Amino acid sequence: MALTSSLGGAAVASEPTPLASTSDIQPVSHTVDKSQVSGSAASPLADKYVIAAPSKTGGFSTDSVIGADGRVRIINTTAAPNRSIVQIEFNGGYICSGALISDDTVLTAGHCVHEGGTGSTADYSWGVKVAPGRNGSTDPYGTCGATQLLTDQRWIDSANTNADWGVIKLDCTIGNTTGWLNYSGTTASLTGTSATVRGYPGDKAFGTMWSMTGAIESTQTEKVFYKMDTYGGQSGAPVYNSSNTIVAIHTNGGSSNSGTRITPTLANYLTSVK
């Protein structure tokens, strides 16, 4: 949830050796029980919106501003592609970011929809609320709830960072109003590609959208690494290229930030469920 973290030391200075991976995703789905009114969406790995100081839990760090903060605030959140970028809230005051990829489908991080590493279907997030193009206290397109949460069994079972992707199916078709972002799956190296990370960080005023553009520094089979500044709350934010096409999902922070890559297999799956 409100987590952009270092997950086992993601720092890279040069092209890393790819992690052992087959890129074979193992998708699973969970139907949201809207009668559930107690409990929290809190993951032990997540931070609440109000972050008094960069906290660390289980080796995860939420502080991923690298050097001087290069992020800029997006004031016009109703322009494209900003209106397709969403803030996600959960019970307990936890937040994430994401992007609409169809009229009723949001792409985000796996740890935004499930705690990860527990193997339990009881650890999906609760009280999901999605606000496209939010601008401070203003929700220009209103908010939507969730009907279904989807992620990867590898994330549920072992918190495999290669599988840290999530999908939220909405109870509305707001994307017909806002439009949505395209995505692209490729096995080619993305190193050197110009990319933007845009979302809702928890160290800024609530509901404000922030952005930074830079180069992808290195590529693995299912991950990309970059030094664009982020913070807890930007988990799930789209990492998109100059054509506004999503190439990764922001998930982790540290001396290098990183995201789960859109592989051809994941892209095909997203197309099947959106």
Task: Describe each model-derived feature in a short phrase.
Residues 3-12:
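C-terminal segment of classical bacterial N-terminal signal peptides
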Residues 11-100:
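Protease-domain processing segments flanking chymotrypsin-fold serine proteases, especially trypsin-like
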Residues 61-83, 91-95, 114, 119-175:
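Conserved catalytic-core segment of clan PA serine endopeptidases
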Residues 80-129, 215-219, 251-255, 259-260:
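Catalytic histidine site
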Residues 92-95, 106, 112-115, 136-138, ...:
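Solvent-exposed loop/turn segments at secondary-structure junctions
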Residues 136, 146, 161-234, 260-266:
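Chymotrypsin/trypsin-fold serine protease catalytic domain
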Residues 229-250:
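Catalytic nucleophile loop of clan PA
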Residues 247, 251-274:
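C-terminal cap/linker of serine protease catalytic domains
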